[in-house]
Amino acid sequence: MNDGGLSELLKLAGRRAVPDEHHMARARAAAHGEWKRLVRGRRRRRLLWVPAIAAAVATAVLAPAWFSSHPAQSAGHAQAVAMADIEVATLQMVTGAITVTPRNAEATRLTSAGRRLSTGDRVETAADSRAMFVLSGGTIVKVDRNTHVSLGRGVLTLDRGALYLDAGPQANDRDVVVQTPLARVSHLGTQFEVRLDGLAVRVLIREGQVEMDAGGGKKWKAVAGEAMRLTADLRPERDQIATYGPEWSWVAELPRPFTLEGSTLRAFLDWVSREQGWRWEYNDQSMRALFDIVQRGPIEGLTAKQALGMVLDANDLSFRETEGRLVIVRGR
C-alpha cells in the first residue's frame, strides 16, 4: 500500500469521539444511584464492587451512543489497525554493519543486536556482515553475507543471498515459509539453508524435511542429508550432502543463544551438537552421571566449538570428532 492509501485509512479511523454531556450525566446518575443502594446493604462487602459496577453502567450507557453515531469511523479504525505492521522478530546478533529499512521509514544502519523487527522491514547484509534474529514463535533465522530479506507475517521473502532456519523443538511457528523468486520453501520441524544461486534456488537440509512449491501443482520434497537445486526451467537437481563440516561453517559463526550458567553439561552438549550438525556420545558408562552436573560461567561471544573445549576442560573431559560424531572422553 502507498502512503496515500495509508493516509486515507487513518483519516477514516478519525479521533475517538468524546461523549456529550447528556450521556455523561446519565452515567454519573446511574453510578451514584447504585452506590447509594449498596451503602444501605452490607457496606464492607459490597463496596468492593462499586468501581466495577460504575464502569459497567458507564459502558452500557455510552457505548451504544458512540457506535450508533460513528459506524463508519469504527469500521475504518478497525481496518487501519488490522493493516498496521506488527513486531515479528528480535535481532539477536550482528557481525559488521547491517541495514534495516522499515516499510515507510528511512533506512537505519545497525552494528549491534536488540532491535525489534516488524512486518515490512527489510534486512540487508553486506560483504563483511551477517545477522541473526529470532521470530516471535522461536524459530532462529541466520542471515549470510550479501543477503536481502523482507519480513512478513509467517513469510520471509528472500531476494538475494542466503538464510538458515532452525525451527527446533522450542519453536511454535513451524509454518513459517521462505519465498524466493522461483518457489516457496516450507518445512516440517527442521534445520535448513535456502540460497539464491544465480537464477536458481538451492536448499540444503540438515534436519527434518523441506518442500519446494513452484505453483501449478509443481512440488518437490527433500530430507536431511539432501540438497535440492531448482533452476529457472523448474527442473530440480538433487545431491547428497553432509550435515556437518565446511558447507555449514558460516552458520556456526552465528551461534544460537545459550546460557551455560545453571545448565547441565548434557544440555550444553545438545546445544553444541545442534549448532555443529554433530551427534554426541560417550563410550564409558561410568561417565553417565557427569552429564547431569550443573555448569557455571559465561560463554557469551564464543562459537559452540570454541565453548566446547573450554567447558569440557573445566570438567576434566575432552573430545574427538570424526565424521559428524562427537565422542566425549575422560582427561584433558
Question: What do the predicted segments below correspond to?
Answer:
Residues 38-45:
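Short, Lys/Arg-rich N-terminal segment immediately upstream of the first membrane anchor
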Residues 22-35, 47-80:
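Single-pass transmembrane signal-anchor helices and their membrane-water interface zones
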Residues 98-108, 195, 235-332:
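N-terminal export/assembly leaders
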